[in-house]
Amino acid sequence: MNYSIIFYIIGWILNLEAAFMLPSCLVALIYQESSGWSLVAAVLLCLLIGLPLVIRKPKNRVFYLREGFATTALCWIVLSCVGALPFVLSGYIPNPVDALFETVSGFTTTGASILTDVEALPHCLLFWRSFTHWIGGMGVLVFLLTLIPLAGGSHMNLMKAESPGPSVTRLVPKVKSTAKILYMIYMVLTIIEIFLLLFGGMPLFDSITLSLGTAGTGGFGIKNDSIAGYSTYCQVIITIFMILFGINFNAYFLILIRKFRQAWESEEVRAYLLIIAAATLAITFNVRGYFSSFAQAFQQTIFQVASIITTTGYATTNFDLWPEFSRTILVLLMFVGACAGSTGGGIKVSRILILLKTVKKELIQLLHPRSVRRIQIDGKAIEHEVVRSTNVYMGVYIFIFAFSMLLIALNNFDLITNFTAVAATLNNIGPGLSLVGPSGNFSMFSDFSKLVLIFDMLAGRLELFPLLLLFVPNTWRRF
């Protein structure tokens, strides 16, 4: 294990976090909020620890996959712990576990909250809370790849460890250039959404914070009723952009280089859009009696379907009051998730496709034992290693899900609350059903249960393995 390079990267992450906190400090200055000092204190702490780690450059900059996984997990833990300080120091979330839960929920783009009154927070902390979504959405280490030089294939090893999905695709030969392209697309889409929301009459602060949450598919609102209080136009714009940010960013790159047909022929993107369409139609007909018109039922339904499948977690209505059929579909969408290579969470549509095609292959193999078939997506054969890792991922996912449910059951809440609480955190969604539904929150859980759910949020965002490898002794052995 190359410890020097790990500390070097952590130092960069702390300095980067200090820079990311500066806009929130500016917001505190604009609104003349005294709680801004807590952000300044966190910035100084980041620099105090981060600068010495960066100044001492490692002699060996070789960065293998083992270091990639360990560094990714450690960076996200450090990022979250320091990011929680403004909430604790300001006194708005005095319990460190609660503050950590809120911050991890932000960075992992989960959007689950322990706050009972969001509107009580000052503007600077509301902005920081939403900005953590944007930082974590594309990945803080992906951003770091655009800034620091590393040896050999080190950039790819970092990107593999943090990027969502069963495999990582380079858009261009250089990984550093790929990271820059991804962030450019990310920023442009975010800015477009901000302007469209402003055009609809939404206040500037609201437009920025909600766009940051949409871009990262996070879901932290700045109002107690989430998005319900905004106009239909604004809700439609947010719906569109939730769907857009749930699409594999490779598709946008293909569109930019005028490969429109190749972008549309993506099996994952088409399956993702088909699932949204089918779920929307099914739920709309099921809940049409709950709204004044079919059009309103459709608009509310597609918003919630987009919010859940992209794992954003915004709400315009209390869908926990919908019929069981509709609630069941929404719970299933929690597991499906968005496309790989997007900012969304969940199992990912690409993994679902691989699993379904694996089942199909095995069934045909039973009927025709001598036949040789390979799993294909977009006309290309999927490597056996990708299929194997997908199967292992699902096995580990089920184990973590079941064990987490068992642990939080010690709180003695109902089964639906426990089940959807784990589903909402492990899949990085935010709201669940029952006590953790859109009108509830996670404040009633014990500190122990919150720590379990914090682990789930980090595990879900990092695709399980980077976090689990921290507990494997072989990870920490020197070369």
PLM regions: where:
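Membrane-proximal intracellular helices of multi-pass ion channels
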Residues: 1-479
